[in-house]
């Protein structure tokens, strides 16, 4: 049996109620972490807490809107107060803010500001709070930022979103250099289109079929695919990895016949 070095460590997962975040919380618990689960969906948090406890680990549930000033700091402080420390932070924040993909000429200033705020600015706020706690504690740790495959290539309909996620990649690299001397690793994962409940509801069957046909491995991510990758990077298996963006898209970045967005 491989020792991942995660037993007894404490992880904080934001955006933890559905999809990738929920899978990450569950898999970190399976790997031995106690987990603080954070999401603004107050009704959904208890279910993820039960997921963690079902794996025999301690859990803290916190309903919080990280867009509010000071909330990221409060969430980190609550995690340490309840679970004793912080070792791993997974920043699964950000989305299209309910706005959906759109041609760039239809992305007005309000659209761009909202998408950048919910992706780059939220991630930066979380990183700042987590890094401060890890450096102060002096025992090192790992910060994992959830980026996107759309940050690595032109993404029709996702100009603001892709740019915000690309900025997260740069933030990840810079923090890796700044925090490395304190023993803190910072990495990012870039999922391709992942079959979360939100994505399943948003995409037509015809579009999904066309997208799968364009992907070299002929499949799309499930949330568990990303969760296993996060666990590997957060564990001692990934102890030499920092400042890296790790793609998990089944080869979609190599596709030349990717279907156009359905709005087009």
Which functions belong to the PLM regions below?
Residues 132, 177-178, 239:
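Alpha-helical segment proximal to the catalytic Tyr-Lys
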Residues 1-3, 101, 242-264:
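Short C-terminal tail/terminal secondary-structure segment
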